[in-house]
């Protein structure tokens, strides 16, 4: 009887652990939680949030990007976008640093700076 009680206790403990790890983290990390974006995070976020938005809009109109049609390298595209968009952010959107580097901003707030 003590052996079966021990195994039952272990099974319940394991079940509790699995339930806690599976369901306990659902509401702890939201993809749109505010975060600080400074330095190279600004062009990276711009590439992830704004370029995807532009590319999706082109797909909706049935106009895929010519770079994607030619099978352009994603790393080349990211490097060029970082170079071009970093300059664009410095000139046109000076407020993105004040808004998202000095205090945290969500993805929705960052998308307001998309050109």
UniProtKB/Swiss-Prot annotation:
Tissue expression: Expressed by the venom gland.
GO BP terms, alphabetized: glucose metabolic process
Prosequence residues removed at maturation: 25-29, 52-94
GO cellular component, one term: extracellular region
4-hydroxyproline: modified positions: 34, 104
Intrachain disulfide bonds: 38-101, 50-114, 100-105
Sequence positions bearing 4-carboxyglutamate: 98, 109
Intracellular or extracellular location(s): Secreted
Modified residues (Cysteine amide): 114
Keywords: Amidation, Carbohydrate metabolism, Cleavage on pair of basic residues, Disulfide bond, Gamma-carboxyglutamic acid, Glucose metabolism, Hormone, Hydroxylation, Secreted, Signal, Toxin
UniProt-recorded Gene Ontology molecular function terms: hormone activity; toxin activity
Signal peptide: 1-24
Short name of one Pfam family: Insulin
Main localization, broad class: secreted
Quaternary state and interactors: Heterodimer of A and B chains; disulfide-linked.
Other facts: Is possibly an allelic variant of Con-Ins T1A (AC A0A0B5ADU4).
Family under the similarity heading: Belongs to the insulin family.
Function description: This venom insulin, from a fish-hunting cone snail, facilitates prey capture by rapidly inducing hypoglycemic shock. It is one of the smallest known insulin found in nature and lacks the C-terminal segment of the B chain that, in human insulin, mediates engagement of the insulin receptor (INSR) and assembly of the hormone's hexameric storage form. Despite lacking this segment, it both binds and activates human insulin receptor (long isoform (HIR-B) of INSR) with a high potency (EC(50)=12.0 nM).
Protein name: Con-Ins T1B
């Amino acid at each position: 009887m003590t052996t079966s009680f021990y195994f039952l206790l272990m099974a319940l403990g394991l079940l509790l652990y699995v339930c806690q790890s599976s369901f306990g983290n659902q509401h702890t990390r939201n993809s749109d939680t505010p975060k600080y974006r400074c330095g190279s995070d600004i062009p990276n976020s711009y590439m992830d949030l704004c370029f995807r938005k532009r590319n999706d809009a082109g797909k909706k109109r049935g106009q895929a990007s010519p770079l994607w049609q030619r099978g352009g390298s994603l790393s080349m595209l990211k490097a060029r976008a970082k170079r071009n968009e970093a300059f664009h952010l410095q000139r046109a959107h000076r407020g993105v640093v004040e808004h998202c580097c000095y205090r945290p901003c969500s993805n929705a707030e960052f998308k307001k700076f998309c050109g």
